[in-house]
Amino acid sequence: VNKKHLVLLSLGIYSLSMPLMVQATDPIIPIAQQEQLQQDRDTQRERSLRLDEERVETVASEPALIDVPSDQNGASFYIKQIQLDGMPKELSFLNKLTHKYEQKNVTVSDITNIRNAFQRKLLDKGFVTSQVYIPEQNLNDGILQLMVIPGRVEDIRYSESSAHGPWRTALVVRPGDILNIRDIEQGLEQMKRVSSQSVTMKLLPGKAIGTSVIELSIKQEKPVYGSISIDNSGLESTGIYQGSFTTSFDQVFRANDTFTMSLSGDLSGSGSIKGTRAASLNYIIPHGKDTFSFSFSKSRYHQMIQSNPYDFTYSGKSTTIKAKWNHVWSRTQREKRAFDISISTRHNHRFVNDTEIPVQALRTTSMEFGVSNRKYIGNATLYSRLGFQWGIGAFGAQPEHTASVAMGGPTSRYHMWLADVDYRKPFVMGHRPASFTSSFHGQWVQGGKRVYSVDTINIGNRYSVYGFDGEYTLMGDSGWYLRNEVASVIPHLNTEVYLGLDVGAVYGKSAEKLVGKAIAGTAIGIRGNYASGLLFDAFISTPLYKPQGYHTKKFYSGFTVGYRF
């Protein structure tokens, strides 16, 4: 047996029995840990995008609706039926309101208030230019007639100083449609998703009665932009100092679409000793209430393992492809509900001196369905999402090792619940603007099954629980973490100081041999984002609670410095 086969055999046996006690000195764990670290970065990036999403509000002139006191001494009429004339099917929800006022005696002032109730219902549903009128009529037959005049879109045009940016893939409405302000808000949100353009909208009266013109004002900047940054978020085993370069291209097909390319890697210059490399491509395109995104990412990690009698290079590479569809199915002035469906494939391979270890190869496919809700409570924002993810045997996924699963081994055909909750509340601290942010993330595997390390939840780094250097983390099949932050702006320095307090826990079969299952930590930091393009973030953190035997620094400091262009 040659030395390569000895190494492969020992690593294969070790990989079957290793617990998810992630420690950088173990020969196999750092690669799995590096893959999890990259996923944690992606999760944090998605969380930041959710929290920073701009609220889209439109201001439209609404008719003044003043209820009139009921005239008890005036003439009254018995209303058997309310008849809505001229009402299109899009406004048929008004029919549900008629029963409330039928089979009653009403006065003239009551009739005005009934009309106001129908008008308020239209406004509540977003039909701000549709009107309800009381025509002349004889009420002796007990039928109250109300005339419904739908407000329609006469035209969609640009203002004189506006850039002629594309709107057809973003706006749901077209000329001739009944105008709903919620549909316009959805379109503006899709157009504002493109970072290089800002959009405002006005409703102007049309030439015909009951029609409106949507006037768009678009300002566009350079469609190519990006950033370069350096941080110390990596691992000792594969390179602490990491560099990244990201560039985005807007309006690739003039459809309010964006293509983004990212490259990252270690800056250690250690050659074959250790290192990381990663690249990703992402494309997103809207279509009215739908948003489609496609992503491809590839990463590779390696380290030199000092072993007796032979040193060897242990490496891993991972490829992930994901497609996602998001659909907004309900929208009000203060709430937005959506569902999303995604499918992703992931191929993981491990090598010793460029020879693959077959027992550690992993090819999986998963699907996910989620429902989300974004609610505005005053000036606060509450986002919540509940998702269900399950492994399937399609698109090149490897067969399930049923015998291994029966003996307690990991499964790729899992069923997992996912939950995310984000809350942000701006307030004033003394005389300075401030904010409180709280974010929860959790996953629960049904049936208590064990999953592969790439599907576990990982806590103990700057992206999950502050206070820990990430060299030793806790992984579990199920688990959660809660991140809390209070931040205050220093206006004259254009910076923000923040205090973080995090806690997390892991559970499941993979966590049974851990030194503990819960940790907590805190951090204080400062960050800035300047008009010149310079950005930075620096913090110092410490554990508040860790199990006995959990090895980490008493104080851990982290930084990110970069430049936007």
Regions found by a protein language model. Name each.
Residues 230-234, 251, 263-269, 287, ...:
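Transmembrane beta-strands of outer-membrane beta-barrel pores
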